[in-house]
Amino acid sequence: MRKIEFFDTSLRDGEQTPGVSFSISEKVTIAKQLEKWRISVIEAGFSAASPDSFEAVKQIADSLNDTAVTALARCVISDIDKAVEAVKGAKYPQIHVFIATSPIHMKYKLKISPEEVLKNIDKCVRYARERVEVVEFSPEDATRTELNFLLEAVQTAVDAGATYINIPDTVGYTTPEEYGKIFKFLIDNTKSDREIIFSPHCHDDLGMAVANSLAAIKAGAGRVEGTVNGIGERAGNAALEEIAVALHIRKDFYQAQSPLKLSETAATAELISQFSGIAIPKNKAIVGANAFAHESGIHQDGVLKNAETYEIITPELVGIKHNSLPLGKLSGRHAFSEKLTELNIAYDDESLAILFEKFKKLADKKKEITDADIHALFTGETVKNLAGFILDNVQIDGHKALVQLKNQEEEIYVSQGEGSGSVDAIFKAIDKVFNHQLKLISYSVDAVTDGIDAQATTLVSVENLSTGTIFNAKGVDYDVLKGSAIAYMNANVLVQKENLQGKVEQISAHDGI
């Protein structure tokens, strides 16, 4: 049975989700969990986009033991140089080169002829192949590319040394039957004396990303690209956890399997949710809270008699656990540090001391501590470090609020606000500290775990009216009002960072496949 390589681009394409911005430490933690999940290749980022993007790719490449690491590069020599430098510390370094091939992209975005595109493919793939052993090539907007020219572009890349050919459905345009035919045509007609592996990369604009990816596998693709929880710009990308479980459950049909350790699926999905600030929908396939819930009495009766009557997937298969951790108020620092290691949470002596102190405070308030609680503690700490501000105090008096913030220079800001309710008053007080032009797009509070004593994660989404950029921010605390203040403070800090730095670092927020 064929084993399909799984290529995760949560840290590159997934981060293009509006409002999502992972810190470097969060990216490294995610990469380590992806390795634990046994992802074949991690696309760690677009290393030429900014110094932070380069550093994130480099740190991930240096941190992993067995997982291949790749960086995205346009068909531009300087991009490739940056990518090569960033991934050189990886045990298995790869480079992913792309250029658009559809008529609309060549005419309006690239403003060059098809002949020039082919010359660029040959030059850049050859240049990359001289520097790393494994090169992947993607013809951007492949599904709107004339089929014979697509074959010509693919053949040019293969002749120049590409081992992997990725066929992106960049705008989520294709259908399963059509996509499968494209793969069969390319696989049958691409000439090479070595093995060439094709892969799908699907966006979910028409809700068919997973179906299209599976159709490509059925047609002969040996690698599949996607993101955890399907995160990504617009409607998102193909959800890798859905593809993996579909291959597992229907291996009789696809005659293929994933390399993933499926029992790490839930933990991986939860980590991405925590760090991205995007809650997993309750009805989400595979990892949603309702994926194994049965409301109908007939269904409940059947499941109690034999789970296979209505469940084709067991919670245990994907690592959904209902037991709490053997950690509590009497647990010591050593046991706590071992749990952090088990959860792939990076720490040093200083951060361990801070996290352990927060853990002990939580254990005094909460009887049962879960993995999600530990992730929430870490998320709250990394967000605070990213922000450079801490919330010293918040006081509520009816519709009035007083907040006290402190920055890294130990400067203290005290502000009062009055609003239609407690949260509105807190936000207005924080607005006076930062004085940004913001629009609050969404505000939500989610319990980290079940129970009346659960920690809460507060999520806010704001628009910087000066630039139109959307930012997601989160605050984690046992107190919902305090968590709300932290989240809104963090959102303001992200806006402040953008206003100070501008967008000069970024090549393009949407320049990718």
Swiss-Prot record:
GO BP: L-leucine biosynthetic process
Keyword flag Hydrolase: no
Amino-acid positions noted as binding Mn(2+) in the UniProt annotation, renumbered to this chain: 13, 201, 203, 237
Domain Pyruvate carboxyltransferase: 4-266
Cellular component annotations (GO), alphabetically ordered: cytoplasm
SMART domains with a match to the protein in the record: LeuA_dimer
Pathway connected to this protein: Amino-acid biosynthesis; L-leucine biosynthesis; L-leucine from 3-methyl-2-oxobutanoate: step 1/4
EC number: 2.3.3.13
Record keyword Ribonucleoprotein present: no
Catalysed transformations (reactions): 3-methyl-2-oxobutanoate + acetyl-CoA + H2O = (2S)-2-isopropylmalate + CoA + H(+)
Top-level taxon of the source organism: Bacteria
This protein's UniProt keywords: Amino-acid biosynthesis, Branched-chain amino acid biosynthesis, Cytoplasm, Leucine biosynthesis, Manganese, Metal-binding, Transferase
Chief subcellular location: cytoplasm
Effect of residue 126 to K: In strain: IL1403
Top-rank EC class of the record's enzyme: transferase
GO MF terms held by the record: 2-isopropylmalate synthase activity; acetyl-CoA C-acetyltransferase activity; manganese ion binding
Pfam families: HCS_D2, HMGL-like, LeuA_dimer
Complex formation: Homodimer.
Function as written in the Swiss-Prot or TrEMBL entry: Catalyzes the condensation of the acetyl group of acetyl-CoA with 3-methyl-2-oxobutanoate (2-ketoisovalerate) to form 3-carboxy-3-hydroxy-4-methylpentanoate (2-isopropylmalate).
Stated name of the protein: 2-isopropylmalate synthase
Organism of origin: Lactococcus lactis subsp. lactis (strain IL1403)
Lineage start: Bacteria, Bacillati, Bacillota, Bacilli, Lactobacillales
Protein encoded by which gene: leuA
